[in-house]
Amino acid sequence: MADNYTPRMKKLYDDKIVKAMTDKFGYKNAMEVPKIEKITLNMGVGEATQDKKKVEAAAAEMELIAGQKPVVTKAKKSIAQFKLREGMPIGCKVTLRRERMYEFLDRLITIAMPRIRDFRGVSAKSFDGRGNYAMGLKEQIIFPEINYDRIDQVRGMDVIVTTTARTDEEARELLRLFGFPFPIEAQEKEAA
């Protein structure tokens, strides 16, 4: 990427979100304002126990979505019922930081989420108590990088947004300002 290029979401954070968060929560220092630290994408491929090529296909799709090569995750323990042995590839994950993270966040919010079938916003209850947010996507085909005709099967993935926020309330406000579509009822309950 060029030296003078700043992702749209990073610019939004610097120009508007820092000020809005400071006004709402009364931070004394700009460094206190929570920010998104990293976004982790995880795709579990259970069918990989029978066919090793499934993990390779999943990793290739994730590389297209994230713009970064994923790490293949391996089984930590052997489980006989699942025909799983220790060290077998069972999925892939990728951790996005800095510019790539902001670019992915932009694509997720503006392009991918509106393409989800029967989409009514993301759950406001998926915070972990420490200001991190996790959500599941049922289909990888919501991303425009994935060619529907080339996929072998529809797979879901987990998207974990790790923030520096100390509370869920701060994290919810941060993600709302970034454009995460939380349902209106959740925002009204929070205000009451």
UniProtKB/Swiss-Prot annotation:
Gene3D superfamilies: 3.30.1440.10. Keywords: Ribonucleoprotein, Ribosomal protein, RNA-binding, rRNA-binding, tRNA-binding. One of its GO terms (molecular function) is structural constituent of ribosome. Disulfide bonds: none annotated. GO terms for cellular component: ribonucleoprotein complex; ribosome. The keyword Ribonucleoprotein applies. GO terms for biological process: translation. It holds the Pfam family Ribosomal_L5. InterPro entries: Ribosomal_uL5, Ribosomal_uL5_bac-type, Ribosomal_uL5_C, Ribosomal_uL5_CS, Ribosomal_uL5_dom_sf, Ribosomal_uL5_N. Belongs to the universal ribosomal protein uL5 family. This is one of the proteins that bind and probably mediate the attachment of the 5S RNA into the large ribosomal subunit, where it forms part of the central protuberance. In the 70S ribosome it contacts protein S13 of the 30S subunit (bridge B1b), connecting the 2 subunits; this bridge is implicated in subunit movement. Contacts the P site tRNA; the 5S rRNA and some of its associated proteins might help stabilize positioning of ribosome-bound tRNAs. NCBIfam families: PRK00010.1. HAMAP family: Ribosomal_uL5_B (MF_01333_B). Part of the 50S ribosomal subunit; part of the 5S rRNA/L5/L18/L25 subcomplex. Contacts the 5S rRNA and the P site tRNA. Forms a bridge to the 30S subunit in the 70S ribosome. This is Large ribosomal subunit protein uL5. It comes from Sphingopyxis alaskensis (strain DSM 13593 / LMG 18877 / RB2256) (Sphingomonas alaskensis). The gene is rplE.
